[in-house]
């Protein structure tokens, strides 16, 4: 009978540590200024890549998508309020969502950032279906700012703490515990 290999936890890599550090810094800053850190932390996690190029790509996807979805959501919600001042016909949001997704995809293609469609669609759906009428503009603007803060934190951390600068520390940790890795994790 063949013996199954033992399960072994993967090591903790630089990207893992820098992502955790970035999200924690965002949360600490937001707690200090009395704001909810959720979307800044999400931006920080999305914005961390294995290097600056990857951070730009990952963070750009999130930020560009959030900005497109945020402005589009504000415009469509404004149109919804013009067409339906009483707010009783929620079903009107369905064709507005369909229109919004089409426009979002076209805009993402125009900006040559097609991977911004998914995060942009999330923001669009939240604004249309889950944001109170009286706060949809402030919600969308806050979401864009918070996402930008998180992405910028991760890009700064990746810029200030590149792999080349951290490798000597990583070697020391690897020698003492054997668990920290320099891989993509």
Language-model segments: residues:
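Alpha-helical transmembrane segments and their membrane-interface boundaries
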Residues: 1-185
